[in-house]
Amino acid sequence: MELPFTNLEVAFILLAFFIFSLFTLASIYTSPNERNEDDDFHLKEKRRKRKEFKGKKNCSDEEHKIETMQP
């Protein structure tokens, strides 16, 4: 009985399966918090700067209110 694939094709199929399994296990066993620590730091820094900027406004909130027009 002959195999439907050559030895080279079988080697590539096994290699692809091994790499796919490796990435699957890596995605399962890595914590998303470890990967996003830097992103969280940058988001917190942006929020802090935004709050500081809001506190430094020179104009009042009344100047920025939109008045609705009555027909």
UniProtKB/Swiss-Prot annotation:
Keyword field contains Glycoprotein: yes
Stretches for region Disordered: 48-71
Lineage: superkingdom: Eukaryota
Signal peptide region: none
Keywords of the record: Glycoprotein, Membrane, Transmembrane, Transmembrane helix
Subcellular location as annotated: Membrane
TM region positions: 8-28
GO cellular component: membrane
Positions annotated as glycosylated: N58
Name assigned to this protein: Small integral membrane protein 31
Positions with biased composition (Basic and acidic residues): 58-71
